[in-house]
């Protein structure tokens, strides 16, 4: 995730043939697939296979599109609820929040990754790419947003 934010991508939601941004632009979901790719997982292939195997789990997708489905927060929220460990959204116990955990915010509008850095209360910093700030950052943002999903990918 840090390698992705180090490229200083600009925030822009855009459709890509093949699915992967290649022009220095990106969105919050790119942090997630990039981090999983660095760990040896092909999130795009996993999401595409799950949509094909269980389309009813993804009612927001009327026609699957492998070029974009894995880059939508609501799709990733559904995928991680089905295939990752679902954890607490309560921030009161910082030890429940570990580096690499995936966090969804609001009405499935934003997603990021927990850092190994923590604030004074023990809550991890968030590695994410946000709009309208147009920044890919690692900072103390989790407490400022409404957490609606918290997942741990176990592979």
List where the protein language model places each region.
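...with weaker cross-activation on analogous glycine-rich loops/strands in unrelated enzymes
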Residues: 52-132
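Proteins with a high burden of low-complexity, intrinsically disordered sequence enriched in S/T/G/P/A and R
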Residues: 4-13, 19, 110-113, 133-134, ...
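A structural signal for short, hydrophobic beta-strand segments that form beta-sheets
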Residues: 43-44, 114, 146-147
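N-terminal capping segments
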Residues: 1-81
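Low-complexity, Gly/Ser/Thr/Pro-rich intrinsically disordered linker/tail segments
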Residues: 122-134, 138-155
């Amino acid at each position: 995730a840090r390698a992705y934010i180090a490229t200083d991508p600009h925030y822009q939601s855009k459709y890509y043939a093949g699915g992967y941004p290649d022009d220095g632009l990106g969105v919050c979901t790119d942090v997630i697939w990039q981090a999983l790719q660095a760990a040896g997982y092909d999130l795009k292939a996993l999401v595409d296979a799950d949509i094909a195997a269980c389309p009813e789990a993804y009612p927001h997708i009327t026609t699957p599109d492998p070029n974009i489905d894995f880059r939508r927060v609501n799709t990733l929220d559904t995928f991680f609820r089905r295939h990752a460990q679902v954890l607490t959204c309560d921030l009161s116990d910082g030890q429940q929040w570990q580096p690499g955990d995936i966090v969804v915010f609001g009405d499935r509008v934003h997603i990021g990754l927990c850092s190994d850095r923590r604030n004074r209360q023990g809550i991890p910093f968030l590695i994410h790419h946000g709009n309208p700030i147009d920044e890919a950052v690692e900072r103390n943002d989790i407490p400022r947003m409404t957490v609606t999903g918290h997942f741990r990918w176990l592979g």
